[in-house]
Amino acid sequence: MAAFARRKAERLARPDPSRKRALDARAAELARLLNGRETFCTASSCDGRVLVLDTDGAGVQKKNCRWLLVTHGTCVKDDVMTALEKATGDVVFKFEPFVFHVLCRELQDAQLLHSVAVDSGFRNSGITVGRGGKITMAVRSTHCLEVPLSHKGRLMVSEEYIDFLVHIANQKMEENIRRIERFHKGLELALEAAIPADTLAPKGPEKSHSVYVHRRKRRSTREQADPSRELEPQDDPESSLDLFAEP
């Protein structure tokens, strides 16, 4: 416990390494909520964004690119067209969804976050246990979008198609925001329940099961009592804990 507290203090004292030098607004709210608890420490994050990147075609976008446009909300076609006027290489239009990494003191703490994340629609969320027992919970999803627009500065698609892409990206952003809001509300409720970490894991042979699985069992009981209830998107019964060790 002392080691986690020391690691948390060191991490929170570091300057923000991102281009923005600050957390995005929605991630900042979640960070304040979690960092106020001794069992959590937030790491890297992004609210989700729409990007227009000018790359050199080498395939390593993060190292060989210029950001022609970036927004953490919805965008309009005219902004994309204006950004394309500055293009000289291979331009890519992207939507990247919310991602949020949290260091957790105990595995049970990570399981609690995982349960809330999956319930909120972030079904690709997972837990990793690294060297030295460092536990990281990653909130993430797969509703990305990446489309090439130009090659060597030459536009390869129509303006009408760009308008269509912007519409799709905005739909994804709106759904992304709804999921973040569900995650935030669910997290507040879970933390307010104030269940001690050592009571989250069941006893006996079932100990290795995730909290999420046991919540599913209780929910199934309610659903049997009300067979007319339809499953919502976040009620996917196939969702499960993604727990694996880093090499």
Predicted regions, residues:
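Helix N-cap motif at beta-to-alpha junctions
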Residues: R105-D109
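Alpha-helical recognition domains of nuclear gene-regulatory proteins
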Residues: L33, H101, L113-V116
